[in-house]
Curated annotation (Swiss-Prot):
Keywords: Acetylation, Chromosome, DNA-binding, Hydroxylation, Methylation, Nucleosome core, Nucleus, Phosphoprotein. GO terms for biological process: chromatin remodeling; nucleosome assembly. The modification Phosphoserine is found at residue 48. The gene is hhf1. GO terms for molecular function: chromatin-protein adaptor activity; DNA binding; protein heterodimerization activity; structural constituent of chromatin. Belongs to the histone H4 family. Pfam families: CENP-T_C. This is Histone H4. Residues 17-21 bind DNA. The modification N6-(2-hydroxyisobutyryl)lysine is found at residue 9. The modification N6-acetyl-N6-methyllysine is found at residues 6, 13. It comes from Schizosaccharomyces pombe (strain 972 / ATCC 24843) (Fission yeast). The nucleosome is a histone octamer containing two molecules each of H2A, H2B, H3 and H4 assembled in one H3-H4 heterotetramer and two H2A-H2B heterodimers. The octamer wraps approximately 147 bp of DNA.
Length: 103
């Protein structure tokens, strides 16, 4: 247990962070213009008003899956820092291989 601080080996079982801001409704940070820009890049001309909430929901689900896998890789390697390779491997596991980030 040397060099691990008071958290021990279990990554999610450390002491509580003292000034941790509670994150709520951050998905609204993906703004309407940001979604519109992504759609424009994909060749979309007009966008229905219902698209924005649906896009946020799908993006949240996608990121939850990628981050869950990346954190699993990190925990398996007994690290506390998620690396770009963890994300690359988690995307590869989901069938979305990307290049240019190592691995």
């Amino acid at each position: 247990m040397s060099g691990r601080g008071k958290g021990g080996k279990g990554l999610g079982k450390g002491g509580a962070k003292r000034h941790r801001k509670i994150l709520r409704d951050n998905i609204q940070g993906i703004t309407k213009p940001a979604i519109r820009r992504l759609a424009r890049r994909g060749g979309v001309k007009r966008i229905s008003a219902l698209v924005y909430e649906e896009t946020r929901a799908v993006l949240k689900l996608f990121l939850e899956n990628v981050i869950r896998d990346a954190v699993t890789y990190t925990e398996h390697a007994k690290r506390k820092t998620v690396t770009s390779l963890d994300v690359v491997y988690s995307l590869k596991r989901q069938g979305r291989t990307i290049y240019g980030f190592g691995g």
